[in-house]
């Protein structure tokens, strides 16, 4: 079995097949957060989403700020020194390893995505501190076995891990199953940080439009659905809240409030 896992996780990252005529989740999100790694089809799709839901740019900004705060909390307050970032997206400012290694340069990070475009950008742009490490794993967010086997090359899975699932579970139909299997696989003392667009009427039209445009459907969820992901885990205060309410930092004072994103962090007891 170990040899089979090694073969599965040591395969080279797939060559990026880029279809610039079809909107891509990572590239559309890259446009929404002000990035330049996108094509005309992505920009047009993003503009259609903004037309349907003018809150979309604020959603993107709030999501990145939540990522920064959760990683900072895990590194600075919870003492986590290794991270598993699933559904990485195209790198931009304030990536997980940058935030974590600003607290402790020895932090180790594994980025996971199954989009070859994302992985090619990650290889080119994500650079660790000399004291720490970053690696990049080609795996689906639902494939817990492949994720854990691949992560074990860089992370010590006998020690707690900070699992980051931000901007990914909304593209997973059976998110509860994916979260549950990952929570079962990581060591006691590990943390899980998640974000999920809520069933807000401002996003409903945008979700319908996105599902007409793209091959990867998006799923909106309510607080009760998100709460079920944390069965058996200890939620960290303030629990499941709109992301701007999750331990806001002074530098977030100008961020918009009431963005329809739910966020939470929990610890495995």
What do these predicted regions represent?
Residues 1-139, 144-145, 149-157, 183, ...:
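Rossmann-like AdoMet
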Residues 141-142, 151-176:
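A short SAM/SAH-binding and catalytic strip from SAM-dependent methyltransferases
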Residues 162-165, 178-179, 186-197:
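Conserved beta-strand signature within the Rossmann-like core of class I S-adenosyl-L-methionine
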Residues 168-171, 197-201:
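Short "lid" loop at the C-terminus of a central beta-strand within the Rossmann-like core
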Residues 182-183, 230:
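Class I S-adenosylmethionine-dependent transferase superfamily signal
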Residues 199-216:
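Short, glycine-/aromatic-enriched active-site segment of Class I SAM-dependent methyltransferases
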Residues 217-242:
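Short alpha-helix
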Residues 239, 244-269:
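Core SAM-dependent methyltransferase catalytic element
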């Amino acid at each position: 079995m170990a040899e089979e896992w090694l073969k599965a996780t040591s395969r080279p990252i797939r060559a990026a097949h880029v279809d610039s005529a079809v909107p891509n989740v990572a590239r559309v999100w890259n446009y929404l957060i002000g990035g330049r790694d996108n094509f005309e089809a992505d920009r047009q799709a993003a503009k259609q989403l903004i037309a349907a839901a003018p809150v979309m740019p604020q959603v993107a900004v709030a999501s990145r700020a939540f990522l920064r705060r959760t990683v900072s909390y895990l590194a600075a307050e919870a003492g986590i020194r290794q991270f598993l970032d699933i559904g990485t997206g195209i790198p931009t400012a304030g990536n997980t390893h940058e935030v974590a290694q600003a607290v402790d340069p020895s932090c180790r990070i594994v980025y996971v995505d199954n989009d070859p475009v994302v992985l090619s950008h990650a290889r080119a742009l994500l650079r660790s501190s000399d004291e720490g490490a970053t690696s990049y794993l080609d795996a689906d967010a639902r494939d817990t076995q492949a994720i854990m086997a691949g992560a074990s090359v860089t992370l010590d899975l006998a020690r707690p891990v900070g699992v980051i699932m931000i901007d990914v579970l909304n593209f997973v139909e059976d998110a509860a199953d994916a979260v549950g299997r990952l929570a079962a696989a990581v060591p006691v003392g590990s943390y899980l940080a998640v974000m999920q667009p809520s069933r807000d009427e401002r996003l409903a039209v945008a979700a319908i439009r996105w599902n007409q445009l793209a091959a990867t459907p998006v799923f909106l969820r309510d607080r009760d659905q998100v709460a079920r992901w944390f069965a058996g885990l200890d939620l960290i205060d303030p629990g499941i809240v709109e992301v701007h309410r999750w331990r806001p930092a002074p530098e977030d004072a100008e961020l918009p409030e009431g963005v329809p994103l739910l966020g939470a962090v929990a610890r495995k007891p």
